[in-house]
């Protein structure tokens, strides 16, 4: 007999992944409590300046398709910039252009939108989060998971038939009593700026630009509402000169690699960041299938490639109907849940490999190697590799995307 519980499900973490899972569970008829440690929403933190501008901005076609059912996609696309193509440059010389519509996907573009806007669009479909609620312990038992929650100075217990950790990487400790994980720290350092007034003279506002410079990569992405996100790999002493400030370093990198002083001058505040890869060994954390971990808490991949948040959204899209069916029938659904876990971990490893490849391609290189790379890219883009790259850079190799491809659909 199932013991009495407070909720069908508890989702820990009200970022975009946690909010989406809670919305989908609610859409499938599950009474769901959404807990968030932080007091404000991402939007209020962004306005106050307490949230870094190093937040995810890219939503790829599989994630846009997954968000459709709850109505979030329509709201997102009302405000997003649509990235329809990518272009590779060597300074001002265009090496190749990749049209994302070549795959014939439901959404032939990526959406560029601030993460707080994505969260707002998703939250309109789901339960309101209980904020300022920090989960300190999870205890799965037969038929129930006990959740210790601290609000202010008081700690109390909530119970649910299932609990999902969706805290982001900062809350991975909640999963560690139940699973190990592999971790790789990259040596690479980056500087990033969202510049609302920036115009990249090499392309229009629907084109993302990757500049392959021998000193390191420069990325230039359209922003919703205009402007550009600029990301450059840097060294501590670029060209033998110590960087005076992060702003100076990024402006210099943009001017040298893009060949545009005007683009460099548009840079204001700058955020430094480093990257790492972490993947848990298991996403289903207990044998009974009542405790799970998804999103960045489960798999953290290099943001060079922009797939991290999308991975988590696809985790949630696949888990929600299975978990709802399991709770509705009080049935283990062991085979289906194991298949979901296998697919999501495989997709995380694929995204991690792609991120590692992008990271390696973005590193400084000798003049000879750079010349070979610049000569090889135009030739490669005249081969079937063009479609393969389009799939790779729109998350087409994610297991969820592969199952929904038009050429894989049944009659």
What are these language model-derived features?
Residues 5-7, 153-162:
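Core beta-strand elements of the Rossmann-like FAD/NAD(P) dinucleotide-binding domain
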Residues 2-17:
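Beta1/beta-strand and adjacent pyrophosphate-binding region of the FAD-binding site
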Residues 162-275:
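Conserved FAD-binding catalytic core of PHBH/FMO-like flavoproteins
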Residues 45-125:
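Active-site-adjacent segment of FAD-dependent monooxygenases/related oxidoreductases
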Residues 131-145:
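A conserved short coil-to-beta-strand element within the FAD-binding core of flavoproteins
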Residues 322-411:
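C-terminal helical "tail/cap" subdomain of flavin- and related membrane-associated enzymes
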Residues 13-27, 122, 267, 273-357:
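Conserved mid-domain beta->alpha element of the FAD-binding
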Residues 26-55:
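Glycine-rich FAD pyrophosphate-binding loop
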